[in-house]
Amino acid sequence: MATRRAFEILSQELTIEDKEKSERAKSIFSPALLQRLKDARKELDPKIQIDISIPQVYDANIKDIWITLGSPRAFDNNRQYELMQWMTLTIGVKAARQTDEEEKFSNYRGRVAKGLMDGAHFKVDVEIDADVEYKVSKPKSPDGNNDSVLMYDRGRRPLIISFETPYFEPADRMVAGRDEDDEPIMDWSWRIADIDQLLAKEALDERKAK
């Protein structure tokens, strides 16, 4: 239900300039995804209306969970850090001052342990089986005639939606505190970071081009 509502808000954001609705969209979608969709929107006639909806969701399954640990500065081609990657886990740690042969194991372990606590970010790819509806139309004319549909498509298909957390720096900021039952208090929300791996594919193409 929340995802269906998110697409309604996205449609409004891409069609109507409204400060309140814009703030709502920013709280639901990541800045990178929202900007990418807005850039694509600018290439179209500003008068057209865009409606993206998910009338029915039949099933949903977690596809992948991506975990990133370490300072976010480690992922900016920073030579002061080194990256360790395994499957969907990436860890950024301070680079060693010594070679692998010279560094003591205790120093290596301490370096990695500190890196784990410097920051944390989680992304979950969820594949949903749903009816997806797209509609691009011109607004109704002054005489009240029906809007002119320029493009329409509806069909049942798999849709991959990526949800992400904020980047917690340090990692323990993920938990704001504890309630009276000692349960963790979370003062953050998941955001939609990608749709059908749009940004992920573009990032991969960009890396291949280098």
Label each PLM-derived region with a short phrase:
Residues 107-210:
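Compact beta-sheet-dominated globular domain cores
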